[in-house]
């Protein structure tokens, strides 16, 4: 009888060891936007399998619209929204959606630029001018207008705004349909044939406005609360994977360019330009200064009429990030 039991036990152990790793790994559904600047970070995470290397079984859910991940997490269709718009993340938390903001992943990086031959010499000269920027309601728009107001004394009534996406704004500027534009560095790198002059950095001006060292946060990672409660270690591992991906991208920009060529059907030149902006665009941090920067941003959005309620302090959960820093 004992021999039979030993044989059965050995068989069960052998069967367990023969189960493929993905079936043993913690499952999670992760959504990200594949048409914006979150594409770079998301593609590297997905293609290089950083989360899987932490023992996670990830189903990547891709969205064609910027608010797709936040809408999906509201309905609990995904467990994690990666690089979701920061203002929307705080907005759904303020509305009572059971989510936790656990990581800052993308910087609201942009430059205020004019054509090289423009008579405009400084940001203060933009009074009465037409400025191209992201549409009202976006985090970048709220940040840019707040900087113009607080740092340069330019009220919204002092200039007109031409809204558009990055490609449209670049075209407006090159065709002299606007006097200045608020454009991301990756866009500027892709239109090198157009000679531009930089008047100011959104990141630098934000730090003056917020009186801190944290950059303005464009995107965050948010987790459905029930998933986090049941799988705290899995979320910490995902954040650790994100931190590893950040370092990889910084050190392997040519490889990032190759990934982007395939993932986004970019030309080699555009993919290289995109990859070279990695260090200025992405982060994987959730320190007190990052949270303070997020809250300051949301205050600005509220002041502009884009929100009415504050996200509760409990929506900012540093626990997973703290645990992730102890994981290799």
Feature map (PLM): residue ranges:
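Bacterial N-terminal signal peptides
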Residues: 8-18
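Short, solvent-exposed loop/beta-turn-alpha elements that line the ligand-binding surface or hinge
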Residues: 49, 53, 203-214, 280-289
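Sec/Tat signal peptide C-region and signal peptidase I cleavage site
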Residues: 19-25
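Short, glycine-/small- and polar/acidic-enriched structural segments
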Residues: 26-163, 172-175, 179-185, 199
């Amino acid at each position: 009888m004992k021999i039979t039991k030993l044989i059965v036990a050995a068989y069960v152990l052998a069967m367990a060891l023969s189960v493929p790793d993905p079936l043993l790994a913690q499952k999670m559904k992760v959504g990200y936007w594949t048409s914006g600047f979150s594409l770079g970070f998301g593609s590297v995470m997905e293609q290089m399998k950083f989360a899987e290397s932490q023992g996670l079984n990830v189903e990547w859910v891709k969205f064609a619209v910027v608010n797709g991940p936040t809408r999906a997490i509201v309905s609990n269709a995904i467990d994690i929204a990666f690089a979701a718009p920061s203002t929307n993340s705080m907005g759904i938390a303020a509305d009572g959606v059971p989510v936790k903001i656990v990581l800052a992943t993308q910087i609201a990086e942009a430059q205020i630029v004019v054509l090289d031959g423009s008579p405009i010499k400084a940001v203060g000269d933009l009074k009465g001018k037409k400025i191209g920027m992201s549409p009202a309601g976006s985090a970048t728009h709220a940040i840019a207008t707040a900087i113009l107001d607080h740092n340069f004394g330019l009220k919204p009534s002092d200039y007109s705004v031409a809204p558009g996406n990055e490609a449209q704004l670049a075209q407006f500027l090159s065709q002299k349909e606007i006097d200045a534009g608020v454009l991301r560095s990756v866009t500027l790198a892709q239109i090198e044939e157009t000679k531009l002059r930089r008047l100011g950095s959104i990141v630098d001006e934000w730090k003056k406005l917020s009186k801190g060292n944290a950059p303005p946060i464009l995107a965050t990672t948010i987790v459905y609360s029930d998933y986090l409660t049941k799988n705290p270690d899995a979320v910490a591992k995902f954040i650790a994977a994100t931190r590893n991906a950040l370092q990889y991208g910084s050190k392997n920009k040519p490889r990032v360019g190759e990934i982007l060529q395939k993932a986004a059907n970019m030309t080699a030149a555009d993919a290289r330009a995109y990859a070279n902006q990695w260090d200025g665009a992405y982060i994987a941090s959730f320190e007190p200064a990052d949270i303070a920067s997020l809250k300051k941003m949301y205050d600005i959005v509220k002041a502009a009429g884009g929100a009415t309620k504050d996200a509760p302090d409990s929506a900012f959960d540093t626990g997973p990030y703290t645990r992730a820093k102890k994981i290799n």
